[in-house]
């Protein structure tokens, strides 16, 4: 679709109000976090972890936590960008009824979005697979820092190499010299970020909340997502079954491109600048 027509179509949806935004990794690239399918993304640097590996493969789990100890620092320092703040403005103006994000970086929350569902969780929390205890990631990081003095500073890190799930590729000798901390409650090292990994279902409470948001919306705008993961693609399918228009704003090809009402192939940040200007926000 021609850019002017796509912009006009998205603006009309927003002017009518009650729009549900669905966001993906492309929203956070301007914050310095590569998406999964970029040249530096994890699907090109090696596959992401699975739930089964966290639960049953101590070597893979140890490797992840060594890599994540380094990569999470970059994620924690990342700041919301203009797209995150644009979505906050649209929500405060009463044009967005809610946001469903597939991202686990917590940047929508930190930007101030209120009616928000983090479909795949948030890296800011960890969970013990042994006893179920949850705690803030920063508390685990403090224990890891105590057990691994000087570890982070000894590694030359390219921030652009950090994956959306918070880890970064490390040489084996760095992985081997890393010491893992245990659960604050039971001491088990069976820890996992409280996010949905491959082989793990989206919690039913989040599915229910997404269904409620979609039921109350008149349209859906997808931003920065190829919708390759079924949990995001399903929202588009359900919206269209209900006769609700769907727009996609994304820089690359996506799974739902052939079926949406408005397809705007462009960078997400500049697109939302144009949207806010058109709405006088």
From Swiss-Prot:
The record's listing under Gene3D superfamilies reads: SIR2/SIRT2 'Small Domain (3.30.1600.10), TPP-binding domain (3.40.50.1220)
Q: What is this protein called?
A: NAD-dependent protein deacetylase 1
Q: Please name the HAMAP family in this protein's record.
A: Sirtuin_ClassII
The protein's location, in the record's own words, is: Cytoplasm
Keywords (alphabetical) are: Cytoplasm, Metal-binding, NAD, Transferase, Zinc
Q: Which residues are in the Deacetylase sirtuin-type domain?
A: 1-281
Reactions the enzyme catalyzes: N(6)-acetyl-L-lysyl-[protein] + NAD(+) + H2O = 2''-O-acetyl-ADP-D-ribose + nicotinamide + L-lysyl-[protein]
Q: Where is the active site?
A: 120
> Gene name?
cobB1
Job of this protein: NAD-dependent protein deacetylase which modulates the activities of several enzymes which are inactive in their acetylated form.
Q: What GO CC terms are in its UniProt record?
A: cytoplasm
**Major subcellular site:** cytoplasm
Please name the Pfam families in this protein's record.
SIR2
**Where does this protein hold Zn(2+)?**
128, 131, 183, 186
Q: What's the record's note on cofactor binding?
A: Binds 1 zinc ion per subunit.
**Main enzyme class:** transferase
